[in-house]
């Protein structure tokens, strides 16, 4: 009888432990503010951090963050070492293998061709030839991939979004690619005559979260939480903390 009681206690303890397993999120080490601030290899603030924190809290789960190089994020997801990747687009992971659920789009990322104040004339990306373009190591730029493959343009990879803009600022190259949020954050304390300028829109990409389908992960509950965050205006309120906007209308999310 005592053995049966002990077995029951152990089973209950195992069930509680399973329910309390943390929700494991990936953080790309190349990200920068306002997306995320990383201190001592852990995120501490930023748009994506706030979204993930709220997502886990509403699911009554603790959040665990794995900071990894962007090139390894997909592999980490496929291996089951993380449960959720936020700030993701299907076009960035065309060869993803496994069973996953995608959220509705939460934000619209606008990628810009960026230059310095002395070279701020609007420029069609297709007109660029024999240019070195500042890029982030491991980032995919679908609209410019043919130009890179054909060597019409050359990548100059830096390890983070901030480093790309810093190298542009000191004229290591004439053009770089960055998103509107990172550009605005980088420029926020610069005098007007020193602010980097967007000279063309490269791409506009809906981004959301992807959750690994596993019996231990409440994927559908997480999808409902993200939908509620979007429709209630919580995503927009998070964006406003960082003086920016999601790019999606608050009352009518874009289709997945």
Q: Whereabouts are the PLM-identified features?
A:
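Extended ligand-binding regions for polar small-molecule ligands
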Residues: 46-58, 118-121, 126-127, 131-132, ...
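Acidic, polar ligand-binding/catalytic clefts
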Residues: 65-127, 137, 141, 198-201
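Short beta-strand-to-loop elements that line the ligand-binding cleft
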Residues: 62-69, 152-167, 199
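Extracytoplasmic small-molecule ligand-binding "clamshell" domains
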Residues: 19-98, 135, 157-158, 222, ...
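Short helices/loops that flank or line small-molecule/ion binding pockets
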Residues: 71-83, 127, 161-182, 189
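Periplasmic-binding protein-like
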Residues: 29-31, 107-112, 188-227, 246-256
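Bilobed "Venus flytrap"/periplasmic-binding protein-like clamshell domains
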Residues: 30, 42-54, 116-150, 156, ...
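Ligand-binding clefts/hinges and TM-proximal coupling segments of bilobed small-molecule sensing domains
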Residues: 62, 140-155, 159, 227-256
